């Protein structure tokens, strides 16, 4: 008998699909429809707020196509909780106008194919990687997102029997399969849940994305992979868009959901600000100018969310990458050890550009900078970075505006000269109105890689310096000593 890979299980999952009896709905008195909508919206909002649970996630989705009208997705710690939710919905007045079209029961799973060390030698797995795998078992549902759910199984035909293959061969194919999926990190988030012994097929796959074509693309590309092409068998696909329970009246009235806020275009066809979100890139100039942008709406969204975790985020001017930074009072060696574990996992993703620890030139603090190709990937990484030891509020928290000058990478022969120049500039800054604090942060792995962190009373005060002759002279001088052009980002 072939070996079975070990598995670990997390939350139980219920995908509950309903069709609406539109004839009965249209014929119902207005007061009955209003009462039914109020009842259902309250019920669904309570499920999303975990009014009757300690942990979990719930979401409401409109479904496009004839298979269903509504999809309710619930993650809970036990099957009993899902059973109670399903029966409780049937007690609502709204349920009189619906009929269950489909349901699917599963449990979130990770397997030894993708995480052998996690199972074989758990003590050797660093905390960052362990947190990553454990987060897979308790997934989040993005706020404003498209969804594609489908069940699948592995074939057991005489010439295509997945379960007869040696485990090493299966693991190798799954590794290639996983590498393909990683190309969509930051664009598509997935939840893999086992339904072996729980439902008709073997897994339930739930894909979330801001751009529905990203879901189409990942499924399309994976169809050509050997795991899917030879051994994959797929069930029906359910495709839709999440909307808040409060928009249920708009859904039943045939209006757009999610309902626009502040105008017809308030919700773009793929905008969201929740964790695991995505954002379009914008083009910059050639980097020679030194005016600065405070970022677009997506940038503002990620900054606002991460600020709650004492993580500061922004987009380097003229770049299509996103950066997050946090400050810690942990020792450099201890912090680096933690970050190195996280970085090992980050580097599995094509959207990862760089994660590094920087030590203060003057202040007794460290910074962790993580740079990604997409806002959503930076946002996701920040969730793990927030768990690093001794994360603190930024020094000079009384300021209303901060800057992080990134990638001042000097030519090795000019590094000492650059540090000396910084000390001179810091002296000028100390006398400037509205300036609170500035420090040079140096990469603990590369002395030539630095960024300057500043705190100002306001953006106007900071801009006064960046427009000054002193700064212009420094920029001119820097062209001769820097190995690459500097990147700047404002962090409000």
UniProtKB/Swiss-Prot annotation:
<feature type="compositionally biased region" description="Basic and acidic residues">
    <location>
        <begin position="264"/>
        <end position="301"/>
    </location>
</feature>
<dbReference type="InterPro" id="IPR007138">
    <property type="entry name" value="ABM_dom"/>
</dbReference>
<dbReference type="InterPro" id="IPR010644">
    <property type="entry name" value="ChdC/CLD"/>
</dbReference>
<feature type="domain" description="ABM">
    <location>
        <begin position="402"/>
        <end position="490"/>
    </location>
</feature>
<dbReference type="Pfam" id="PF06778">
    <property type="entry name" value="Chlor_dismutase"/>
</dbReference>
<dbReference type="Pfam" id="PF03992">
    <property type="entry name" value="ABM"/>
</dbReference>
<dbReference type="GO" id="GO:0020037">
    <property type="term" value="F:heme binding"/>
</dbReference>
<keyword id="KW-0479">Metal-binding</keyword>
<dbReference type="GO" id="GO:0016491">
    <property type="term" value="F:oxidoreductase activity"/>
</dbReference>
<keyword id="KW-0408">Iron</keyword>
<keyword id="KW-0349">Heme</keyword>
<protein>
    <recommendedName>
        <fullName>Putative heme-binding protein VNG_2021C</fullName>
    </recommendedName>
</protein>
<dbReference type="InterPro" id="IPR011008">
    <property type="entry name" value="Dimeric_a/b-barrel"/>
</dbReference>
<dbReference type="GO" id="GO:0046872">
    <property type="term" value="F:metal ion binding"/>
</dbReference>
<comment type="similarity">
    <text>In the N-terminal section; belongs to the ChdC family.</text>
</comment>
<feature type="binding site" description="axial binding residue">
    <location>
        <position position="177"/>
    </location>
    <ligand>
        <name>heme</name>
    </ligand>
</feature>
<feature type="region of interest" description="Disordered">
    <location>
        <begin position="253"/>
        <end position="301"/>
    </location>
</feature>
């Amino acid at each position: 008998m072939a070996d079975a890979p070990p598995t670990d299980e997390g939350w139980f999952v219920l995908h509950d699909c309903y069709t609406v009896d539109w004839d009965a709905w249209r014929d119902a008195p207005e007061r009955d429809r209003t009462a039914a909508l109020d009842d259902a919206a309250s019920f669904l909002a309570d499920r999303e707020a975990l009014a009757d649970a300690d942990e979990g996630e719930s979401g409401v989705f409109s479904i496009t196509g004839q298979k269903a009208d509504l999809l309710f997705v619930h993650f809970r710690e036990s099957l009993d909780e899902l059973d109670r939710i399903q029966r409780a919905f049937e007690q609502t007045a709204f349920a009189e106008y619906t009929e269950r079209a489909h349901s699917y029961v599963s449990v979130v799973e990770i397997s030894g194919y993708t995480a052998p060390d996690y199972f074989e030698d758990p003590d050797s797995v660093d905390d960052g990687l362990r947190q990553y795998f454990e987060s897979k078992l308790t997934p989040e549902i993005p706020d404003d997102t498209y969804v594609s759910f489908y069940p699948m199984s592995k074939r057991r035909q005489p010439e295509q029997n997945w379960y007869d293959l040696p485990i090493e061969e299966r693991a190798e194919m799954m590794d290639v399969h996983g590498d393909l999926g990683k190309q969509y990190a930051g664009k598509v988030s997935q939840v893999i849940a086992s339904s072996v012994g729980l439902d008709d097929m073997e897994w339930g796959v739930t894909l979330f994305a801001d751009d529905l074509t990203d879901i189409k693309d990942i499924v399309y590309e994976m169809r050509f992979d050997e795991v899917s092409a030879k051994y994959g068998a797929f069930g029906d696909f359910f495709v839709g868009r999440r909307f808040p329970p409060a928009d249920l009246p708009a859904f039943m009235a045939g209006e757009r959901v999610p309902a626009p806020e502040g105008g017809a275009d308030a919700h773009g066809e793929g905008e969201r600000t929740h964790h695991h979100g995505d954002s379009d890139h914008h083009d910059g100039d050639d980097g020679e100018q030194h005016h600065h942008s405070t970022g677009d709406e997506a940038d503002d969204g990620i900054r606002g969310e991460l600020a709650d975790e004492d993580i500061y985020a922004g987009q380097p001017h003229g770049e299509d990458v996103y950066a997050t930074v946090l400050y810690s009072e942990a020792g450099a060696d201890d912090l680096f050890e933690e970050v190195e574990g996280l970085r090992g996992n980050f580097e599995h993703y094509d959207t990862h550009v760089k994660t590094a620890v920087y030590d203060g030139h003057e202040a007794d603090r460290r910074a962790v900078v993580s740079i990604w190709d997409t806002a959503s990937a930076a946002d996701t990484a920040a969730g793990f970075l927030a768990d690093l030891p001794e994360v603190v509020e930024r020094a000079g928290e009384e300021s209303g505006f901060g800057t992080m000058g990134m990638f001042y990478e000097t030519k090795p022969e000019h590094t000492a000269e650059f540090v000396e120049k910084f000390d001179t500039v810091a002296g000028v800054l100390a006398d400037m109105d509205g300036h609170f604090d500035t420090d040079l942060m140096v990469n603990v792995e590369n002395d030539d890689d630095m960024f300057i962190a500043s705190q100002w009373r306001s953006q106007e005060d900071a801009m006064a310096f960046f427009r000054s002759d002193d700064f212009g002279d420094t920029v001119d001088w820097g062209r001769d000593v820097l190995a690459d052009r500097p990147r700047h980002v404002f962090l409000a």
